[in-house]
Amino acid sequence: MNVIDDALPQDIFNQLKDIVLDSPWKLCTNVSGLKEEKNCYFHHTYYHTRQWRTPQYDQIKSIIRGQLDEYLRMNCLVRVKANLYPRTECVYHHQDHVDYTTPNKGAILYLNTNDGYTVVDGYPIESIANRLLLFDPQVLHHSTTCTNQQYRLNINVNYT
């Protein structure tokens, strides 16, 4: 596991955040397969199953394959997905999961600072804007909600 603060130049980070916030969002009424009343979030999948699935693919691709590849050193993208978790009264932990059963690598870029976090193998990583978390997504991990911002926003990248 590796944490990199200020992963992107500020202007590129701001551009990426604007693109993500402008994306069409889908409501998902369960997180990690668990369906509960307070267990919902919004997501937008930019890339999955070997194809770009968004009108913003040129911009997202140039940042992921360009700026972030300094850290990721990708051979092949598996998935690029943004998650938006609405604020809750208390920080709510989602269910532990693994992203894929096939070997891959994972990265989470946090797009805003809040009191939510990602827990990887029991270790919490704070959500700080422009922080990049590199980790093994086959290790149990989970997300949380936040209480001190309107939402918690990040981009997940799975790759080989």
Where does each model-flagged region fall?
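A short beta-strand-loop-beta hairpin characteristic of the jelly-roll/cupin
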Residues: 90-95, 102-104, 110-128
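Short beta-strand segments enriched in hydrophobic/aromatic residues
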Residues: 84-86, 111, 159
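A short hydrophobic beta-strand segment most commonly corresponding to one strand
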Residues: 107-108, 149-160
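Short beta-strand His + acidic residue motifs that chelate non-heme Fe in jelly-roll/DSBH
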Residues: 95-96, 140-148
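Non-heme Fe(II)/2-oxoglutarate
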Residues: 1-75
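Conserved metal-binding segment of the jelly-roll/cupin
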Residues: 87, 125-142
